Amino acid sequence: MAHIFVYGTLKRGQPNHKVMLDHSHGLAAFRGRGCTVESFPLVIAGEHNIPWLLYLPGKGHCVTGEIYEVDEQMLRFLDDFEDCPSMYQRTALQVQVLEWEGDGDPGDSVQCFVYTTATYAPEWLFLPYHESYDSEGPHGLRYNPRENR
């Protein structure tokens, strides 16, 4: 089992969360909420308003999201779902626990896989950086789900 940290459309209440609940993809168990220990730019970009965590450690904000424990089957599914390694790259990062279910305490640090990208348009660096993502957020950039494209 591995920990993954999701910050965008895979979070609870977001457009793609349903794939985390589909056991045909493997197992994913919610473990808590956290934030990246290092700062990163979280931007919303492209014609479909996709959230992207740019792999630029030290720039942007500590990003909040959710921590899941996943099995190997779900990890492989998510790699495919996130078009890894072409669109996103699966990166191991330290995540500080904000709220935890079960063993563990707030303030602890957990190593998680996170889908980041090092391949992006240069103008993305000038987009607003977000601390957290909500498809319905005040940014007004509603995500366009895959099934609508």
UniProtKB/Swiss-Prot annotation:
EC number: 4.3.2.8
Catalysis: reaction(s): epsilon-(gamma-L-glutamyl)-L-lysine = 5-oxo-L-proline + L-lysine
Gene: Ggact
Function per UniProt: Contributes to degradation of proteins cross-linked by transglutaminases by degrading the cross-link between a lysine and a glutamic acid residue. Catalyzes the formation of 5-oxo-L-proline from L-gamma-glutamyl-L-epsilon-lysine. Inactive with L-gamma-glutamyl-alpha-amino acid substrates such as L-gamma-glutamyl-L-alpha-cysteine and L-gamma-glutamyl-L-alpha-alanine.
The keyword Lyase belongs to this UniProt entry's keyword annotation: yes
Keyword terms: Lyase
Naturally occurring in which organism (per UniProt): Mus musculus
Location of the active site: E82
Assigned protein family: Belongs to the gamma-glutamylcyclotransferase family.
Protein name per UniProt: Gamma-glutamylaminecyclotransferase
Matching Pfam families: GGACT
